[in-house]
Amino acid sequence: MTEDKDAPLREDIRLLGRVLGDTVRDQHGEAAFALIERIRQTSVRFRRDDDNAARLELEGILDALSREQTIEVVRAFSYFSHLSNIAEDQHHIRRSRAHLIAGSAPREGSVAHALVRALASGLPPARLAAFFDTALISPVLTAHPTEVQRKSILNCETDIAHLLDARDRMTLTPEERQESDEALRRTVLTLWQTRMLRPAKLSVVDEVANGLSYFDATFLRELPHLYANLEDQLVSRDPALAGLELPAFLQVGSWIGGDRDGNPFVTADVLERTLAMQAGAVLGFYLDELHALGARLSLALGLVTASDALLALAARSPDHSPHRNDEPYRRAISGIYARLAATHHALLGTEPPRHPVAVAEPYAAVAELADDLDVIHRSLVANGSAALARGQLRRLRRAVRVFGFHLAPIDLRQNSEVHERVVAELLATARTGTDYATLDEAARVELLIEELATPRPLASPHVRYSDETEGELAIFRTARAAHRRYGGPAIPNCIISKTDDVSDLLELALLLKEAGLLRPHERALDVNIVPLFETIEDLANAPSVMDRLFALPGYMNLLAASRDRTHEVMLGYSDSNKDGGFLTSGWALYKAEIGLIEVFARHGIRLRLFHGRGGSVGRGGGPSYEAILAQPGGAVQGQIRLTEQGEVIAAKYGNPEVGRRNLEVIVAATLEASLLADRAPAPRVEFLDTMQALSDVAFAAYRGLVYDTEGFERYFWESTVISEIAELNIGSRPASRKKGTRIEDLRAIPWVFSWSQCRLMLPGWFGFGSAVKTWLAAHADDGIARLQAMHREWSFFAALLSNMDMVLAKTDLAIASRYAGLVKDVNLRDAIFERIRNEWHDTVDALLAITGQRELLDGNPLLKRSIRNRFPYLDPLNHVQVELLRRHRETHDDARIRLGIHISINGIAAGLRNSG
C-alpha cells in the first residue's frame, strides 16, 4: 500500500479548521458557525463545477449578510488562510525531516546537493571553501505596502507552529495530548480575539520593529546554524580543512529606515533611530547568549587547563567573586559581558536589562569582542575541550562576525530626480550663475567631475537651503556618523532609483563627498554607489551607462582603491514589468545582464547584481533557486543580492526552520550558478531571436491594453481594490508617487497587489498568449518544436514558463468576473474583461503546448495540491470582498464595511502567499 505523504497535512488542516470552528461557535453561536459552513460549501461548488446556481445562491447569501455577520465571515476565512499556511509550512518541515532521516540523496536546492554537484564536476573541497573568501550573498528585507502582518498575529502563529511541531516530533501521552489540544485552543482563541489590523497607519519605526522581529525569530540563530552546517559538510569531505571558519559571506540586509524613494517619513532622525534599534537588538542578543554561556562553562582549574591568553583575559575581568577564583572561563565571560554592557551604554545611552558585575571599558570596535571570544575558543580547543567550543560559543562567535554591532547593513535609496535637484541647488549657491538643470548630459558630467576633484565642499553653513536639500545632506551626515559609531558595514550601499545616465551616479558621488563619505584626495569611497535601472528603456541603456562611467579615470581609481574593483548594479523587476509586461520585462532584464557582463569584463571590474524582486511573479518573484540558476553565465560570480519584500518575508522567514531552508536555497543556487555555469551551454542564437520576436508582440499587446485602451484606467480603479488599498493602514509609503489615478504614477507594488486580490494576476502573464499565437502563425512548420526546445534546453525560458504556470493556476476567471461586475460602464466592462479572458485562454493553451502538460501545474504537483487544499477556503473571501466593495462604494461612511474590506485584503494576501 502506497504511503499517503500528504495525509498528515490534511489532518493538521482539519485539526486547525475544527479548532477555529469550535472557537467561532463558542464565541458567536451555532448560527454563525452554520452560516460560515454554508458559504464555504457553496463556494466549493462554485469553484469545482463553475455552477451558476451556486453563484446565484452565494450572491444571495452574501447580499443578505448583516454588517456584523460579514465581519465574522471575513475574519473566519482570513484566519483559516493563516492557519492553513502554518499547516503547510509544518508539512514542508515534516517532509524535509523524513527525507533526512531516511538517508535519501540530498534534495535539489540544498547546500548538500550543491556540494555533491560541484564535487562531481571535479572541484576539490578546498576550492569550494576558497569560493566563499570572495563571495557575498545577501537577501535584503524591504518594507512595502503589501506587508500586512501584525507582530501580535505573528506571535500567535509562531506558537501554533511550535505546538504542531511538538505533536509531530514526540510521542505524546494521553495527558500530554490533552495539554497540547488545550494549548492549541487557547492560542487560536487568542488569535481570534486579537485585532488583525492596526488602528493607525504604520510609521517607519513600526516597520523597523516589525523587521527586527524576523531577526529575533530566525536570522540571529539560524544564520550561525547554516554556517556551521556548511563548514562541517566541507570538512567531512576533506579532513585537511579541519577548523575551517568561513568568512561572513551570507548577510541579511535591510532597506527599512533607509529607503527614502517616495517616502518623506524616512528622515535623518528616523535613520539614526533605526540604527540604534538594530544595535539594541543585536547587543541584547549577545548579552543574553553570554549570560547563558557563562552558566554553562563552569570548567574549574585542576580539572582542566587553560591557555595563558585565557588566564590573562580572566585576570582582567572585574569579576572578583571568590566563588569563581578557579573558574577562569566564567570570569573571562563576566569580563566580556561587562565590556559589552558598557558598549551598550556607550552606543545607546541605556543600560542593558541585566547589569554586569562591575563597570568596564566599552569595546571600541566589534573586532575586539570577536578577539576575546576567539581567546576562549582557542583555549578550549587546545586543552581538551574542543567539543565545548563547537556548541553555543561557536554560534555566538559566528553571530558576532556576521551581525557586528549593527545587526543588518542598511541600504540608503533615493530617486535620481531628488539628487539632481539637491545638486542643482548646491551648485547654484556655490557657483553663482550655474543652472545645472538646463545642462545637457555631457556638460553635467564635465561639471560634476570638476567638482569631485575640488577639495572644498559646496554646502555652506551660512546658506539656508530648501527642506529637501537640508534633509538629504542630513541623511548622508548621519551615515558618516553611523560609520564612526557602528562601523562601515552599518551603511554599505547608496542606491539611485530611476538611473538613466552617468550623471545620476556622479550626482550621488558629489553628495557623498559633501558628507565625507567620498574623499577623492585619499581615493577613498566608503559606500557602494549602486545604480538602479528600472524601466524597459533604462535596462536597455544600462550597459552603455556603465561603459561610459568606467571610461572616467577618476571613477575607476576609486573602484580600484576602495571598492576592490567591484561594482554593484541593481535591476528593477517591478517597474519594468508595469512598464512593459511580464515577458518583455524578463527578456529586458536578461539582455541587460548579458550586456553588463560584457562591459564589466572588458573593464576588468567584478559585477555584483542586486535583483529587486517582489513577492509576486509580476514583480520578479517565484522560486529563488530556479531564478538564480536561470541567470546568464557570468552574472553571479559568487556575489548576489536580492530583495525580500512584503508578505514574502513572513512566509519565508516567520518560521525558523523554513527560514533556514530558504537561506540555504539562496546559498546553494549561488554556489551552483557561480561554479557550474560554464558547464551549461549558452542559448542558441535562434532561441535569442525567437525570444526577441515574442517580446515585441507581448510588449505591444500589454501596452495596447494597459496604456492605449481608452477607459482602462477607469476599469482598473473600479474592478480592483486599489482605492481601498490606498486607505489601508499597512505601510508607511504612499501607494502613488504623485496624486491622481494615472497608472504611470502608481507604484508597481499596489498595482500588482490589486490584480492579485481580484484573482486575475494580470501582470504575471498578459501578452504571452498573443505573442506565441502571432509567432506560431509565422512559423507554422517548426515553431512549436522550437519553443519546446527552448523550454527543454534554456533554463531562463523554463523558469519564465514555470513562474507563469504558477500565476495562471492561481488566476480564477469566475471570481475575477465578479470584480469586473463592479465597473459601472457595462460596455467598458464587457469589452475589457472579454479581452483579458481571451488572452488568458490563449496563454494557457500556449503554455500547455510548449511544456507538454495536460493541465496547469502538472510539473509542480506540490503546489497543485497546495492550491487544491487551500483555495476552497480562500474563494469565499473574494466573494465577500466583492460584496463589501459594492456596499462601500455606495455608502462610503460605514466603518464596519471598511474594516471588513481591510480584513479581507489581509486574508486574501495570506492565502495567495505571494501577492505583492
Curated annotation (Swiss-Prot):
GO CC entries: cytosol
InterPro entries the UniProt entry points to: PEP_COase, PEP_COase_bac/pln-type, PEP_COase_Lys_AS, PEPCASE_His_AS, Pyrv/PenolPyrv_kinase-like_dom
EC number of the protein: 4.1.1.31
Keywords from the named record: Carbon dioxide fixation, Lyase, Magnesium
Reactions catalysed: oxaloacetate + phosphate = phosphoenolpyruvate + hydrogencarbonate
PROSITE patterns hit by this protein: PEPCASE_1, PEPCASE_2
Entry annotated with the keyword Ribosomal protein: no
Active site per database record: 144, 578
Keyword Ribonucleoprotein on entry: no
The protein's name: Phosphoenolpyruvate carboxylase
